[in-house]
Amino acid sequence: MDTFQVIILALIQGLTEFLPISSSAHLILPSQLLGWEDQGLSFDVAVNTGSLLAVVMYFRHELWSMFKAWTDSIITRKQTDESKLSWWIILATIPAVIVGFTAKDFIETYLRNTAVIATTTIVFGLLLWWADRMFRPGFTEFQVGWKKALVIGVAQAMALIPGTSRSGATITAALMLGLSREAAARFSFLMSVPVSLGAAILVTKDLISSGQTIDYQALSLGIIVSFVAAYTCIHLFLKLISRMGMTPFVIYRLALGAILCAFMFA
């Protein structure tokens, strides 16, 4: 990829990773519109690393408090709000790990296509609208509990289907379970840390074992661009979500799904 492609694709990944609009649906558009080739493993490493650094940096104080409370809970058996939240996030990560390891090849072979992405973009967009309109949530992320955490974790596992959107699926589930908009988003973003870390490790392992030549300039640029885009996106989303709700993202998803359908039948 040339520098322009790296910047555009890293921007797309960074901006869409934490919005409920599906990054995979957007990353398929350059190939459809411009005929760009697959981004390659180096790019995957870059954007996964950039997104991970962004969410860790943004929630650095919360994550540090959670980590200390979690280690204390193991040593002293004392549970606090932060330690409970840590355990719930660990629990919520398990379904995605199981599905990721057992169904990765099936998903990549049979589900990563325009038809699936267009369908899931529309269907899960409508579910997001329903969850946001029909429920009157008020819980915080510290009131999730292990049952709700597991349900949200299952939603995160379902988001391995391209076009679903990890943040979209988890926020939808959290809203249905009674969390406030901001709490649903915060829990979703905190959940992304172990998932993004695991993805970055696995893709890096694949890159090393593939023997591909690493373009360190493109790798560095991709990390920087995706980091800045993702960090900005997280900040603005949390700042505005309570006031504007999910409707703008639902409308956007429906329009994007329609565009992808148009490409299929063109």
Curated annotation (Swiss-Prot):
Presence of the UniProt keyword Cell wall biogenesis/degradation in the record: yes
The enzyme's E.C. designation: 3.6.1.27
Compartments in which it is found: Cell inner membrane
GO molecular function, one term: undecaprenyl-diphosphatase activity
Alphabetic keyword roster: Antibiotic resistance, Cell inner membrane, Cell membrane, Cell shape, Cell wall biogenesis/degradation, Hydrolase, Membrane, Peptidoglycan synthesis, Transmembrane, Transmembrane helix
Catalytic reaction list: di-trans,octa-cis-undecaprenyl diphosphate + H2O = di-trans,octa-cis-undecaprenyl phosphate + phosphate + H(+)
GO cellular component terms, semicolon-separated: plasma membrane
EC class of the enzyme, as a word: hydrolase
Transmembrane segments: 1-21, 39-59, 87-107, 115-135, 144-164, 183-203, 218-238, 246-266
Membrane-topology annotation of the record: Multi-pass membrane protein
GO biological process: cell wall organization; peptidoglycan biosynthetic process; regulation of cell shape; response to antibiotic
Role played: Catalyzes the dephosphorylation of undecaprenyl diphosphate (UPP). Confers resistance to bacitracin.
Family assignment from sequence similarity: Belongs to the UppP family.
Extra remark beyond the main annotation: Bacitracin is thought to be involved in the inhibition of peptidoglycan synthesis by sequestering undecaprenyl diphosphate, thereby reducing the pool of lipid carrier available.
Protein name: Undecaprenyl-diphosphatase
The encoding gene: uppP
